[in-house]
């Protein structure tokens, strides 16, 4: 009886150890699966962040909406797209139906009389019904920007000031030694001064982002 009881106890202990070892192996397997799963999630998150980091940054802080229309007009009028994006961002923040208190309209905030003058210089009829169409508005604005850059020999500050205040006002300032010393222009309009700063800052940012994307593409 004693030996039988001892054998039964040994068998019971063996079964207990077997169940314990099996449970440990199962728990170990589950832990390894969780570790692998967590690693895959982290790797996927990093990959997604790398792919979408630039577009998210670009489109939320410094959008490049209507890119096809902008690039088409820039090729037509020999402009840097970064400058046009900077002007649109400053003028309307890419809102195609924007209307200012003064009556400027669309993405590049074209005044009706300015639109008529641009169309006349282009030898075309001004179509006010299309002023909120991105391609039409951008074409008018890019023509004007190109005209001003040519007039002021590529000076972005003067061109931006003229885009905001009109080239007649800028011409007066340039002829007045109180505002222009032959090198530096003091803009007497606070609104225009702030506008020029915003355009220049945005232009530099768009150029930086473009260069960053080119560098990333070469890696």
Q: Which residue stretches match the model-derived regions?
A:
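Extended, non-globular alpha-helical segments
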Residues: 26-37, 109-110
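Catalytic glycan-binding domains that act on GlcNAc-containing polysaccharides
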Residues: 49-219
